[in-house]
């Protein structure tokens, strides 16, 4: 286990390159101390060496990645620089459409699906000069379980530790230096779980902040697309590129997109709220981490006050039922016609969606609206809500074996995450501690709708005084 070295040596080997943050490697490419081709070749070698064990990639794209890297180098040599992502290897979750690679979404049904167009987020990455290096592994259909015939990504900190779902490949690859940032999705915690478990940084934006066009649905009104990186600064760079209105996605907001990375200094001290009454179900590692975060915020002068949130646990239960209905709709073309090709966890969830009565669904919709109204009232008093990034601290694979089948386990995990998919509020997940066995713990800063800029600035400030984001796994 080593700390990333902020002092960049004159010549970098594969290991040193892999430890750089996105913005650090981007600066070396921009100043031509490294070429994009060198960085891409180094990253591909690292993938070839480590990913047979880590299993973070569903598809690696060496030919197209190297072609994009060489094109980036030629552009930069001519003085045509597109911005921070130009020439930087980025991975995308395998539910984002890509014209040059299959999009299987963690399934076997779609393993040969070749989209005719890129997802909007992928098109925006390419337009910014990013090198798409591969498609990252995930759970089946972005739900809680892996398809039985497909490999499971391995946590680079500890192979016995859970890597999170469903953007597990994103978390593993970003932590292990197999890309310099990635694009994941989050329906109930799927950016925040892997970032927490793998010790990286992730943003679940406001619902509608980032286009979902060309992204395979799990549950349309809960799905959020966002970045996973090593730092808040890096996440700000990616979010600035992928956010914004899209004529192909009518649910995508026309709210103006600031340059989140242009000015990372806080313009005022944020007021932070914690509802301690809803943290009693968390384990000892999680509550100790939260207490340490509160002490850190107090030390830097941020007021932390007690707040009363609407009840989270009932909303997790409601979310589970409503998500199942939306998933059943999303899979109508292949389920039940090809039900035998689905894994058991995904099958059970879709079946539950088919069984839910319309009257109950409408009742749950009313509860969703009331929860969102109540949450907005809390944000009259605070700017940020504090929550762990998962309801269970760095569990083992054995502990999580029943996920998706054990309702109590699933509810415990999702209590601090899924309610904010229900409301659509943005959240940034930050490394914030470690367990006794050295595995990472994460904290969430949750903000008002479309207040990602404050979250990025607050996350950056937190990372300047903690440094957990500079830890690297022992691979």
UniProtKB/Swiss-Prot annotation:
Disulfide bonds: none annotated. Its EC number is 3.5.1.4. One of its GO terms (cellular component) is cytosol. The keyword Hydrolase applies. It catalyses: a monocarboxylic acid amide + H2O = a monocarboxylate + NH4(+). Gene3D superfamilies: Amidase signature (AS) domain (3.90.1300.10). SUPFAM superfamilies: Amidase signature (AS) enzymes. The active site is at residues 93, 166, 190. It is an enzyme of class 3 (hydrolase). PROSITE patterns: AMIDASES (PS00571). This is Putative amidase AmiD. It comes from Mycobacterium tuberculosis (strain ATCC 25618 / H37Rv). The gene is amiD.
